[in-house]
């Protein structure tokens, strides 16, 4: 039995800047964020990935839950999560920080550097300078490891962010979140259902330091070491997919299962021995 909520009388939140693939329907209601699927099965990705991260050394991440959303006489599969931002806090993206401090887009800033390692080093130094946060290299490396494993194609400079305390001016890290465009979720445009999964994986372009996931991942790990340790099994993958089986067709469930099994085999070094 699926969970359902009617948001027809609620106001939409503008999300144009936070995704490279259009404006996803999004609401903030009663201290919870609701997101409707826009390109394919984003909600499934958020839920399943957060379930799997429970079996890892990653402690600070957003936990998502599946939901059917009624809005404007239509029904959407999607997900919801608790709002991790307090009333006196704002989300500040890397792109916003760059425009504020450098008067330039950070995506353009990165064009000054050819090697991914130099791009990552520059990014870490800039973030630490303006936010005063420590261990930014470890934080970004873990993000790149998770993005590579889960094939997240949407980690651009408007989708890397920090939490600002509006009263004190102090920053803290965002929990790891926003994995919606992972696991070939975009079935509407780039990764149609019915096509060979492994050929589609080869088409994915990573962000923001290189188009290849492993190239930017290797560069970050050379600088800051490997950060993420996973411990979920194939049975844990099956359990996570069972949690969303009432919301998505069987062919989507099986496609994601195949992808996760393959990624688990490829990135064995990330798993706890």
Describe the role of every protein-language-model region.
Residues 42, 46, 139, 153-156, ...:
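Active-site-proximal structural scaffolding
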Residues 21-25, 116-119, 131-132, 209-212:
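Short hydrophobic/aromatic-rich motifs at helix boundaries and adjacent loops
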Residues 63-72, 156-166, 273:
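Short alpha-helical "patches" and their helix-cap loops
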Residues 118-185:
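Conserved kinase catalytic-core segment
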Residues 29, 34, 64, 81, ...:
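Generic structural hydrophobic/aromatic packing signal, biased to beta-strands
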Residues 37-38, 54-56, 166-273:
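C-terminal catalytic region of ATP-dependent kinase domains
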Residues 1-106:
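Conserved ATP-binding subdomain of kinase catalytic cores across diverse folds
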Residues 84-144, 247, 251, 266-268:
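ATP-dependent phospho-/nucleotidyl transfer catalytic cores
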């Amino acid at each position: 039995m699926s969970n359902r909520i009617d948001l027809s009388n609620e106001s939409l939140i503008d999300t144009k800047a936070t995704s490279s693939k259009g404006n996803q329907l999004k609401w903030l209601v009663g201290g919870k964020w609701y997101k409707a699927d826009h390109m394919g099965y984003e909600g499934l990705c958020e839920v399943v990935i957060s379930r799997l991260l429970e079996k890892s050394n990653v402690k600070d991440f957003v936990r998502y839950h599946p939901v059917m959303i009624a809005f404007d006489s239509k029904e959407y599969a999607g997900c919801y999560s608790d709002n991790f931002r307090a009333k006196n806090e704002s989300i500040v993206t890397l792109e916003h920080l760059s425009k504020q401090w450098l008067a330039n887009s950070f995506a353009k800033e990165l064009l000054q550097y050819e090697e991914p390692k130099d791009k990552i080093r520059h990014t870490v130094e800039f973030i630490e300078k303006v936010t005063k946060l420590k261990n930014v290299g470890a934080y970004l490396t873990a993000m790149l490891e998770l993005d590579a494993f889960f094939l997240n194609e949407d980690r651009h400079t408007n989708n890397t962010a920090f939490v600002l305390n509006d009263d004190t001016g102090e920053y803290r890290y965002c929990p790891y979140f926003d994995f919606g465009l992972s696991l070939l979720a975009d079935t509407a445009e780039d990764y149609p259902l019915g096509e060979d999964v492994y050929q589609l994986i080869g088409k994915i372009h990573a962000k923001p330091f290189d188009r290849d996931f492993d190239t930017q991942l290797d560069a970050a790990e050379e600088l800051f070491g490997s950060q993420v340790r996973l411990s979920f099994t194939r049975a844990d993958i099956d359990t996570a997919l069972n949690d969303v089986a009432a919301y998505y067709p069987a062919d989507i469930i099986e496609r994601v299962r195949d992808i996760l099994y393959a990624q688990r085999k490829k990135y064995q070094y990330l798993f706890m021995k």
